[in-house]
């Protein structure tokens, strides 16, 4: 998504802590390159399953969620261009911006970002028992049952791709602050075909080609 930034970040994020410390006092950037010095290496690039700061800081420079915080801390649309909330406060419907693309680490266009990618992302989080699931497992309808094994059909979980560019979450109870949770990597999109192709190598920390951007 933010491919122009990530092409510089991918290599930096994978350098050792020692190397970073050694060069922390020196930096050079061109007018088209974004540089950032990390304090520690991410153990994984799987932004869905990891809730650690190194992964979050590295990957969110290249991958977007539905909403994001501006420099003043206000929630603003990112991949979502608009949203609505049902009168009972239980259903959030997001319109996904058309034209948002997935890119490989080489900057090659891979696919459109669609509503289905957000469904795939949450299913990946649930199946992998992501560390941050506690943030949403009691929020999204049916998710706690899926995690406990009481329900084995993910289609019963309250996240649906109504069409390619319409995503819907159904909550167990009203949460006025729900939109803030969409900024967590846990609820970011994942391309299903890419995830299947990579298998266990998805998000491998030493391989910038292991995720899309």
Give the ranges of each region predicted by the language model.
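N-terminal lobe/hinge region of extracytoplasmic solute-binding protein
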Residues: 37-87
């Amino acid at each position: 998504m933010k491919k122009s930034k990530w092409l510089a970040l991918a290599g930096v994020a994978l350098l050792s802590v020692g190397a970073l410390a050694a060069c922390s006092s020196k930096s050079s950037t061109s007018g088209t390159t974004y540089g950032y010095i990390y304090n520690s290496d991410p153990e994984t690039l799987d932004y869905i399953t990891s809730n650690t700061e190194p992964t979050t800081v590295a990957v969110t420079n290249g991958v977007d969620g539905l909403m994001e915080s501006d420099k003043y801390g206000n929630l603003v649309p990112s991949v979502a261009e608009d949203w609505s909330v049902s009168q009972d406060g239980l259903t959030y419907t997001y319109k996904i911006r058309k034209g948002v693309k997935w890119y490989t680490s080489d900057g090659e266009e891979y696919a459109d970002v669609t509503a289905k990618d957000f469904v795939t992302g949450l299913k990946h989080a649930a199946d992998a028992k992501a560390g941050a699931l506690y943030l949403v497992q009691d929020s999204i309808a049916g998710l706690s049952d899926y995690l406990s094994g009481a329900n084995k059909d993910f289609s019963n979980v309250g996240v649906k791709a109504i069409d390619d560019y319409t995503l819907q979450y159904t909550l167990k109870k009203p949460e006025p602050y729900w939109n803030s949770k969409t900024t967590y990597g846990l609820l970011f999109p994942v391309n299903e075909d890419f995830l299947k192709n990579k298998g266990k190598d998805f998000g491998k920390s030493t391989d910038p080609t292991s995720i899309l951007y």
